[in-house]
C-alpha cells in the first residue's frame, strides 16, 4: 500500500467549452486512482489529453454522449448537458501504488495510449507521482486509518472540499470469511485482518473515513457486503458500485432485442469474454478480440448462427466509464446523497447493497440508463440548492 500523491497536475482549459449546464467552476475536486495499471494509467492519461484539447473524450457518457450522433439518429446527448458536473479542468489528480511510480511511466508501460500522445503529455503525467510506501501496519484497520490520513492531506494540499477514490485493483472472486452485515463487522474484520478483507475494502474504508466517494472499477465480492454501503451512508458520502460493465454487455442486450423483434428464439450462446478484473488483460478474448457466439431458432426447424467479434482494448472503455462514475459520484455528493447509489447501476455489473431491499435495479441495461438520466435533474436541483445554502 502506498501514500497518496500530493501534487496538483497541470490543467488545460477544461471540457466545458460547449456545455449547456455549467458546474461549480473553480472548485477543485480530488480524483485519486488506486493502482497505476492498465485502467488506472488510462484514466489519468485520458483526462490530461482531454483537458489539454489533444483528443475528444469519446467513450464517456458524461463528456461525449452518443458518439456525436444527433438524438433523432440514435445518438444521445452528453450527460453533462443535464446536470452541473465538475469540469475535467477542476480535477486534482492523485494516485496510490505499491511502488514508486508516476503516470507517465505507467502509461508507457501499459501501452494502451499512443506513445506520441503520452510523450506530448509528459510534463503533466510526470507530475502525477504515486509515492512508494507499502507501509508496515499492525492491522489492516491501522492501514486504512493511515491511508485516510493521506487522503485528507491530499484534499488539504489541493484545496478540494470533495473527492472520489477510483479503485482499479482486482478483488476477491468469492468470500472466504464470514459475511459483513454492519460497519462494526467491517471494522472488526479489518482489525483481525481476516480473509474477507481485500485491498479494495481497505481503500474503501479509508475513503469513507476521509469523506471521499468511492468507485470500484473491478469486481470484488468483499465490496458487495451490506456493511460497505452502510459504512458510506454513515459517513455521508456516496458509494457508486462494483465492477464496471464492458461494452459486450450492451451488445448482448441489443442483439437479444433484435432477436425478440424478429421472433427468433435463442437456443444457446457462448461468451469468450476476458474477465475485466484481470489487471494484465490488455484486450478482449485472448490476444486481440472478444467473440460472442449464439444460435437462434428459426422457421420450420431452421436456425441462424450469430457470431460477433469486437476488437479493442478493454482498459480504455473501463477508463472512460470510471471517469463517468467518478463525476456522477461527485455530483451525488454535492447533492447530499450518501451510501449506495443504486441509480448508477447502469454502469456496473453489481449495484451496491441498498438499505431498502425492495429498491431493486431495473432489469435491462436500457431501463437502467433511463433511470440514471431521470435522476440527473433531481441531482442538479439538489446540488444547486446546496450551493445556494452554502
Descriptions of predicted regions:
Residues 170, 219-220, 244-245:
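Short, ordered loop/turn segments at secondary-structure junctions
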Residues 15-18:
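Serine residues within intrinsically disordered or low-complexity segments
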